[in-house]
Amino acid sequence: MKGQRLLFLLYFATCVCAQPFASDAVPDSVWQDSITGIRTHLQHVDSLAPYKCPLHLFGKKADGTPKQPALQAMIENIGINALVLGWDHYVQHREWTEITSKVLERNLTGAWVWDNDSFSGNQFAHPYHGSMFYNAAREHGLSYGVSLIYPIVGSSTWELFCETNPPAINDFLSTGIGGAALGEITHRTSDIFFDNTKTGAQRVAREIIGTFLNPVRGLHRIISGEMFRINRLHAGKKEKPEPYTFQIGAGDRYIHDIGTFHPHTQQRYHQHVPYLDFRFTYGNHYNNLDEGKATRAYDYFDLYALVNLSPDNPTIGELDIRGRIGSIQHQLPRRWKLDIGLYQNIRYIDHYGKDGQHAGNLAIISEAARFG
């Protein structure tokens, strides 16, 4: 036992004493284990500083940050649209992807409209699409304010060049504004899961969940190889860790409507809908008062999601997000606290059955862009 303990101490000492080195052939520092000889690439990312993108289309500066990050992010925006359009055209065979020169001329010169496409497509898929534009900018170290431009530009190019349908105002708002909100939330939430110090099954699970939340960052990690490297010194975080709480619940809703007949059974609408619901709170609501920190965009937000487990109902039944953009806080007498701030809200409720039948008289509503 003593021998094993001594061996462990010697191994630990050699690992601690081993020094990272740099060379012209390997621009990033490399950690070399003095016993095994295994080299681990280190990015030396300070968790308190903006993250340095591992991809460098135009080379990188001496500090490791990419040259032309804004241009590189814009190129990725074009690539995202091309990838989504290719999927819809070649795999889904969507009719609205048959783009011609006449369609482009009409889109560029004609008036914008308010379309009436599918509820889930307009109110959920578009913000999710916009979040990828936004995260392409955040992935390159651009700030929250600058990154807001990218879903707006990405949405505009999609409406003008990627659909046979006339450009739609509501799609532009859902993708541009709703996408920015969803993008910052997935940017921060995925950062909780991605951790380069983890190994084994936990690392695999973290990579899968993080990539599902933030596909752009997951793709960056795959291309750069960061997804498959273990880093003993740095977790690869982009944001300073904030406190968070997570709750999960399960239940069953019984829907019965005496005024609606099911289209197939011709009976009054009634069904059991099992579900899972999730509540996630990120950050400290009163961080300015409690910790003396200046509030930053989305350093505090609430998220509620309901996932239906019934094959007859949409998978995403509800999504409610409230994120703080900025606020002024005051301490009042008797431990009362006052927060006067600007908040962005996203609300999505869909209780239509997959057969198109409304599940009773439960409301469907979406607010992809709301401030208050």
Predicted regions and their residues:
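Alpha-helical membrane-inserting segments
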Residues: G79, L83-W87, A137, T157-F161, ...
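Small-polar-interrupted transmembrane alpha-helices in polytopic inner-membrane proteins
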Residues: G141-T164, G176-A180
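Bacterial N-terminal signal peptides that target proteins for export
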Residues: M1-L7
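Bacterial N-terminal signal peptides
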Residues: L7-V16
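Alpha-helical transmembrane segments that form the membrane-embedded catalytic/substrate-binding core
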Residues: H129-G130, C162-D191, I209-L213, R217
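Contiguous hydrophobic, core-forming segments of folded domains
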Residues: N361-A368
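Outer-membrane beta-barrel translocator/channel fold
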Residues: P166, N170, R188-G200, Q344-G360
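N-terminal targeting leaders of membrane proteins
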Residues: A18-F124, G130, Y134, R138-H140, ...
